Amino acid sequence: MAIEKKFVNDGYVKASMDEYFAEQLNRAGYGGMELNRTPMGTQIIIYSEKPGMVIGKAGKVIRKLTRDVATKYNLENPQIDAQEVKKPELNAQMMASRLAASIERGWYFRKAGHNTIRAVMNAGALGCEVVISGKLTGARSRVEKFVDGYIKHSGHPVEEVVDEGFAVAIKKLGTLGCKVRIIQPGVVLPDSYKVRESVEIEEPAEKPAEKQVEKPAVAPKKEAAKAKAPAPAAAPEPAPTEEPEVAEPEEAEEAQVEASEDFEEAELIYVEGSEEVRRQVNGVWQHKHESYDYWHPMARVHKEAKE
């Protein structure tokens, strides 16, 4: 047998076997099958809502299915295993069978379609599509589609992530095809993406400011040099220390001199041969004379009077 004919024959056997099980196990809630060929034989897994009805009393039903499959499809040593479906709402074949049964019982097709969509989405599916085709109302056949969530229609992901089921409802006007397609929860789609959440970095707490120790003010070198300079020769007392030139206004100096008089009474020294009077206040020599009749430091340079 050519390789092409072998693949076609395998597909035909699987599709025909699926229809046979759906017909025989309709009351057991048939939900699909898997066919695996191994060196030990052919393993068939049947998914059902009621696996007890698939096995039958003392295994009577499952032995009958095994004999029929081996004879009809020429399979060597077939082994059938029945497994229960925990969530029938997420099985496309089961929901298609329920939809067809609801329409046969007389439900309006829109009500049956919306109920099927609602049950599937409440079970946690990412998306669901229900297609009902045939003579719904009137003499002409048409197609009604109900969609909720996200559904893939083409490409390779359709074969991997989309579960598809089909059932037939027989009405007086004719037959109706019921197709259900479901995307299971937790499926990672090729076009899905996740946005990273922004992370806020907390800034470290500021340390308390250290107390700054005030350093004692150091007198400039010029002031220290002038402080060591001897007093004028005309003074009978020890040489007074000279202060550097002060750029402050005369009013500030007068206020300083008056303030010093309140705290300390200094001894007055009269210079012979002139109207100059001297005194020492807080280590600073002061004098006053005819030109400047107020107490001021002796180190201050007097401006010459204009002619």
From Swiss-Prot:
Q: Which Pfam families is this protein grouped with?
A: KH_2, Ribosomal_S3_C
Domain KH type-2 residues, every copy: 17-86
Q: Spans of biased composition, class Acidic residues?
A: 240-265
Basic and acidic residues compositional bias, start-end: 201-226
Listed under GO cellular component are: cytosolic small ribosomal subunit
Query: Origin, by domain of life?
Result: Archaea
Where do the record's region annotations for Disordered lie?
Answer: 201-265
Gene3D superfamilies xrefs: 3.30.300.20, Ribosomal protein S3, C-terminal domain
UniProt xrefs under InterPro entries: KH_dom, KH_dom-like_a/b, KH_dom_type_2, KH_sf_prok-type, Ribosomal_S3_C_sf, Ribosomal_uS3_arc, Ribosomal_uS3_C, Ribosomal_uS3_euk/arc
For this entry, list what GO says about its biological process. translation
**Annotated GO MF terms:** rRNA binding; structural constituent of ribosome
Keywords, sorted A to Z: Ribonucleoprotein, Ribosomal protein, RNA-binding, rRNA-binding
Description of how the protein assembles with itself and partners = Part of the 30S ribosomal subunit.
> What's the stated role of this polypeptide?
Binds the lower part of the 30S subunit head.
* Family designation: Belongs to the universal ribosomal protein uS3 family.
**Can you name this protein?**
Small ribosomal subunit protein uS3
* Species: Methanosarcina mazei (strain ATCC BAA-159 / DSM 3647 / Goe1 / Go1 / JCM 11833 / OCM 88)
* Gene that this sequence comes from: rps3
